[in-house]
Each structure stands twice: as C-alpha cells, then as structure tokens.
A protein has these predicted regions:
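Soluble catalytic domains of enzymes that build or remodel membrane lipids, polysaccharides, and related
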Residues: 1-155
Length: 155
C-alpha cells in the first residue's frame, strides 16, 4: 500500500505522521515516481503546503512513457494541467465534497474542473473522493464519508 501526505498532516508533524504510516506497513511517497511490478508507474506528491514539492511534470519525466502512470495528489487543484500530461489516472481528495451543504457548491467553484467524483479529462481519468475524514467539526451534511476501491485492468 502507498500513501501521500495531506494538508492536515502538515499542520501537526509530517515526519511523525510519516513514521506512523510506515510503521503500519504503508509506503509514503514524497515526490517520488516508482515502478510497480514492472507494469505501471505510481507517483506520489505531497500536499502543496510543502513548498519544496516538485512540479508534476518533473515527476512524470522519471517514468517510462510506454507504461501507464497513476498519480496520487492530495489536492485536485491542478487537474486541468495534469490532463495535458501523460497521466492515465489521478486520485485526489482534500475537498471532502464540501463536507457541509452548501459548501459543495463553493468547492465546485474553487476546484474546477473536478471537485468530486470521476471524470475523463484530456489524456487521463480523474477521481476525487470525499474521503472518510473531516475538517473542523466531526460532521457532514450532503457529503458521505467514503473509501473508493479502484480496480485497474490492463488491455
């Protein structure tokens, strides 16, 4: 299993959170592109609160262009840019689908072209989940907690 850090991880102690995640047997990708079973590439980017994170295009250049590329990027705020890169699938979160109605409409305005759900855009497929957590108060209205299971099949 693989993970990337989100904005709330940077509010606390990203190093301690990374250690805890890795102690649970999950690899945290921090500006890394790694081959998986010689079949596809997985890129993990930290949240944009990390002011030293690399541009996505630099990470994509580290992959084999003949193989599929999956990108984990916490925020969906670069979807339009990523749709022009050779990224086959991007998975993101952060927005919580607005968490409390009517904030989902605000999220749709801020995170264009995709703040929640699935959409094929440009070169790739994009998924933004509402996740299982919350921001601020532990409450949701009009947005369900969720974990997506994405099955990827080859040709």
């Amino acid at each position: 299993m693989y993970a990337t850090l989100g904005n709330h991880d940077y509010f606390i102690n990203p190093q301690a959170i990374t250690r805890a995640i890795e102690d649970a047997g999950i690899t945290v990708l921090h500006d890394q592109a790694i081959p998986i079973n010689r079949q596809f590439w997985l890129i993990g980017r930290p949240d944009n609160l990390d002011s030293h994170r690399l541009p996505t295009a630099d990470l994509v250049r580290k992959t084999n262009p003949a193989q599929p590329v999956i990108l984990m990027d916490h925020r969906p705020d670069h979807v339009a840019e990523h749709a022009r890169l050779p990224i086959d699938l991007q998975v993101s979160g952060h927005v919580h689908n607005g968490q409390i109605f009517p904030a989902n409409f605000i999220a749709q305005t801020i995170y264009r072209p995709l703040s929640y759900g699935y959409q094929a855009i440009g070169n790739g497929h994009f998924v933004v989940t509402s996740g299982y957590g919350f921001w601020g108060i532990p409450f949701r209205l009009g947005s369900q907690s969720e974990v997506w299971i994405i099955e990827v099949r080859g040709k």
